[in-house]
Amino acid sequence: MSPEAIPDPESMLAEQAHDALDPDLRRSWQELADEVREHQFRYYIRDAPIITDAEFDQLLRRLQALEDEYPELRTPDSPTQLVGGAGFATDFTAAEHLERMLSLDNVFDLEELAAWAARIRTEIGADAQYLCELKIDGVALALVYRDGRLERAATRGDGRTGEDVTLNARTIEDIPERLSGTNEFPLPTVVEVRGEVFFRVADFEDLNAGLVAEGKPPFANPRNSAAGSLRQKNPAVTARRRLRMICHGLGHVESSGGSPFPTLHDAYRALKAWGLPVSDHTAQVTGLDAVTERIAYWGEHRHDVEHEIDGVVVKVDAVALQRRLGATSRAPRWAVAYKYPPEEAQTRLLDIRVNVGRTGRVTPFAYMEPVKVAGSTVGLATLHNASEVKRKGVLIGDTVVIRKAGDVIPEVLGPVVDLRDGSEREFVFPTHCPECGSELAPAKEGDADIRCPNTRSCPAQLRERVFHVAGRGAFDIEGLGYEAATALLQAGVIADEGDLFGLTADDLLRTELFTTKAGELSANGKRLLANLGKAKAQPLWRVLVALSIRHVGPTAARALATEFGSLEAIETASEEQLAGTEGVGPTIAAAVIDWFTVDWHRAIVDKWREAGVRMADERDASIERTLEGLSIVVTGSLAGFSRDEAKEAIIARGGKAAGSVSKKTAYVVAGDAPGSKYDKAIELGVPVLDEDGFRRLLAEGPERDAEDGEPG
């Protein structure tokens, strides 16, 4: 594998080690949040993670700990508040789940498990009855059956909206086209079934053998291959892949008899009776001791099952208790995943090479003799930065210990010094960028990371920046994926992201990717041009995000767009004016000022403006300013509003869509599973509205709300 083929490891752990008293605390939070989002994208969208599950879990925990210590940093679009794949554009049609499809919180040792069980016991006043299930390392899928017939299949996505993969799901042998009810378990009118799509180990090995025989690269592990196979554009490819599925839960159920199942165990019996696949390894137990016994057993027998597992999922069995315990914004409180310790192996370190990420960070990678770990073959691992290479003490030629958490790129723990024979050599970090030849240096004194300063034209940074423009948090352009961004740049069709909105059919015909064998523009090419045209009308905050201004994510972008109304006003504003905007502050203000001082940055704006991209928000005069000056926090899920729609409704009426609750908050709008913001509102005495109250507030303002006596 060449350095160019390495997936960009843009954001790594070392950059985030800031002291809690650092005056740039918000910048530290933003960089850590961006790092987590980057790895979520690589895992959920590209099916090509570059760090281990354990490393990602550590990143997410660091972010959670920072937000717990400084709650004012926590925003609705923080990775700690969202389900895995939230905020990323894909090429599939969106499918809204009938009920939120949440993720799971993880625990990594028996002490953490005991703490979770203690919270359950405190809440319900007794030892709970649990279900212990194998945690399959696959891809979550939701099936909707209406009147017994398969209507739709969708991936988890952001928990509210996933990707419609119905055609592909129909090719999976385990998924029935029609369910059959029984006397004991009659079919509901509508039932949403959740489960995991996976490869059996033997089928995965056969798949890779076939790919190699065809001269194609094999998949790294069963999880990635399952994700890639389920998300194929051609269902015939999925059909050949021998995917399997096991069902492990229910979402929305419409039944004439009300809630049909008192326990999850009963629900699983019903799923099996209807003809759906369920696990033979699920156990119904009572109390923590019985749970730990199941965890210990499967820790010793994890390779005895036909598919890969990376832990045991523990769920409160009684459905009534599940409702009582509720959920956070991203995971149920009544379930937890116990993840087994990563597995380790020894192999030889053949070489260390570097790769350049989107922000210019240069990351060393370990190339190793392929070795079997956790059921798959490993030959590549990240070493993070030059300081980390020295800290680990590894030399090229060493026998090293690698640890694999889940089934992604592993971690090099260190060398086996006793096996050295004197032929080993030290890694010398390059002085120049391997992609563009620029001299490398830290961005500032004391940084652990070395960066390429050629932000304008370094090919690696260009690829990532162009792709960023299409992200769901930016212009949300379907069809402009990583492959398309690379093809456009390599063909010289665009010089940078500034050229995107000026693309024509003739331009796309210069790339093989968008040209048919007959030399005509492909359907994907036509779709890309249409989507670029639609994207020109996106609101100002999305334009700001797309510009890749450091620290400016959706929250800050909305604040700036609301305050200034146009890109020209933002560009000409003083640093003091920018910093005085609620939700912005001095760090972001300085970054905005710095960005607009660069000539080629302003040239991007000029190109977009000339191409017809909307650079100002025009307020709808028909919408009354009923919320002028009010700070409103929305928490939990609302039936009639997406997260963005609720924010935009507040902003359009002159209000501020805040991310955290304080004494300055005028109202908290609490939807389903509101989480800690609701608790904070009660503690501070901030009025709390349900969705109906929110609608009245939008329409009539706070005076009518006070007259109506909305709950507070």
Curated annotation (Swiss-Prot):
One of its GO terms (molecular function) is metal ion binding. It holds the Pfam family Nlig-Ia. One of its GO terms (cellular component) is cytosol. Zn(2+) binds at residues 433, 436, 452, 458. Keywords: DNA damage, DNA repair, DNA replication, Ligase, Magnesium, Manganese, Metal-binding, NAD, Zinc. NAD(+) binds at residues 53-57, 103-104, 133, 156, 196, 315, 339. SUPFAM superfamilies: BRCT domain, DNA ligase/mRNA capping enzyme, catalytic domain, Nucleic acid-binding proteins, RuvA domain 2-like. The active site is at 135 (n6-amp-lysine intermediate). Its EC number is 6.5.1.2. Transmembrane segments: none annotated. One of its GO terms (biological process) is DNA repair. Its cofactor is Mg(2+); Mn(2+). InterPro entries: BRCT_dom, BRCT_dom_sf, DisA/LigA_HHH, DNA_ligase, DNA_ligase_AS, DNA_ligase_CS, DNAligase_adenylation, DNAligase_N. Residues 622-711 form the BRCT domain. It catalyses: NAD(+) + (deoxyribonucleotide)n-3'-hydroxyl + 5'-phospho-(deoxyribonucleotide)m = (deoxyribonucleotide)n+m + AMP + beta-nicotinamide D-nucleotide. It is an enzyme of class 6 (ligase). HAMAP family: DNA_ligase_A. DNA ligase that catalyzes the formation of phosphodiester linkages between 5'-phosphoryl and 3'-hydroxyl groups in double-stranded DNA using NAD as a coenzyme and as the energy source for the reaction. It is essential for DNA replication and repair of damaged DNA. PANTHER family: CHROMOSOME TRANSMISSION FIDELITY FACTOR 18, DNA LIGASE. Belongs to the NAD-dependent DNA ligase family. LigA subfamily. This is DNA ligase. It comes from Mycolicibacterium gilvum (strain PYR-GCK).
